[in-house]
Amino acid sequence: MSLLRTHNLTAYYGDFQALFGVDIELNAGETIAIIGANGAGKTTLMRSISGVLRNASNSVLFEGSAIGAKESDAVMRDGIAMVPEGRKLFPSLSVKENLLIGTYGRKVKGYWTLEAIYDLFPILQEKADAPATSLSGGQQQMVAIGRALISNPKVLLCDEISLGLAPVVIKDIYAAFPKIKASGASVIVVEQDIAQALKVADRVYCMMEGRVTLSGKPSDLTRDDIQDAYFGRITK
């Protein structure tokens, strides 16, 4: 049984339909990448899975149970955490306080302690008491990833975590992914950068205009396959 899957998932913003029958599957210990141009529906898919965009059709299944009608806090307690696009840190809080914000009032057990986050991103320990907004964009993204991990999720959703960052910073962030995977977390990465997605993913889904246009292992997909699917010229 897959750890998480969507079945014929649709999503709307008012009368506008953003997703059309999307089927994806994430197995335990796996990293999958969702690629596509702006407006393809990638972020809407992540918002549907995380519970931010509530889905009354119960088309999102986590460990075999529907989560579509749950609030995002309940989804997080069930074991899904999201690193949202744009980082969205609390500007009045320190780096350490931002990392711990999701643990207040909860007993969280697992690999990802504050010390483990500092081991993953040592710069965050150096700047633990600094205001989060005093950090560079890449460092703020590390805080956002650490904040999601510290809840010890079974599934980590990463939405456009490389957006607006320099290539060297993106490389540093993705260098942490083998350790994240080794901790037992399964990961869904949303990326516009096709090359980066192919490096990190066990399987790739390409989206265009709210639909999945291609899926498969990176080793099984040709550059032409991916480019055609990215621009919506084929459906598989």
Task: Give short role names for the model-derived ranges.
Residues 2-236:
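Glycine-rich phosphate-binding loops of nucleotide-dependent enzymes
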